[in-house]
Swiss-Prot record:
The gene is rplO. The keyword Ribonucleoprotein applies. It comes from the Bacteria. Part of the 50S ribosomal subunit. Belongs to the universal ribosomal protein uL15 family. Disulfide bonds: none annotated. Keywords: Ribonucleoprotein, Ribosomal protein, RNA-binding, rRNA-binding. This is Large ribosomal subunit protein uL15.
């Protein structure tokens, strides 16, 4: 059997039902929507409405909150940094910081800082200055002969 001889199983595909194309088609006029009412109109579905039953979003209790002071770090893996070094976009001899990562195209925006995670391997000996790094990431960088400097978070205004 060749690739061009493959066919769908019998009855597995259906042709599209053309609605509202005359009474003889069997699905003309109302097109399977019944007569009148909200569901016969366009733009029907009411999200979260369960027909008078208490909807799920009201049956379940409220939980948690959004912390407006939470730090939003941009996450970068060691693999991404190593790829940028291999491609010549990052210089391993200079200090790697948020600005250098942005200039190299590793990250798009800085937000509240950069956090390095240990996904992948790092071969280059780099000096990196970031807002955060996971313990395995720090261990991998130091094992490769590099150093990690963590920036202290700015003090909250009082």
């Amino acid at each position: 059997m060749k690739l061009n001889e493959i066919k769908d199983n019998e009855g597995s595909t259906h042709s599209r039902k053309r609605l509202g194309r005359g009474i003889g088609s069997g699905s003309g006029k109302t097109g399977g929507r019944g007569v009148k009412g909200q569901k016969s109109r366009s733009g029907v579905a009411i999200n979260g409405f369960e027909g008078g039953q208490m909807p799920i979003y009201r049956r379940l209790p409220k939980r948690g909150f959004n912390n407006i002071f939470a730090s939003d770090f941009v996450v970068v893996s060691l693999a991404r940094i190593q790829t940028a070094i291999d491609a010549g976009k990052l210089d391993a001899k200079t200090t790697v910081d948020a600005a250098a990562l942005k200039a190299a195209g590793v990250i798009r925006r800085v937000k509240d800082g950069v956090r390095v995670l240990a996904d992948g391997e790092i071969k280059a000996k780099i000096t990196i200055v970031v807002a955060g790094a996971s313990k395995p990431a720090v261990e991998k960088i130091e094992k490769a002969g590099g150093t990690v400097t963590l920036l202290s978070a700015p003090a909250a205004a009082e």
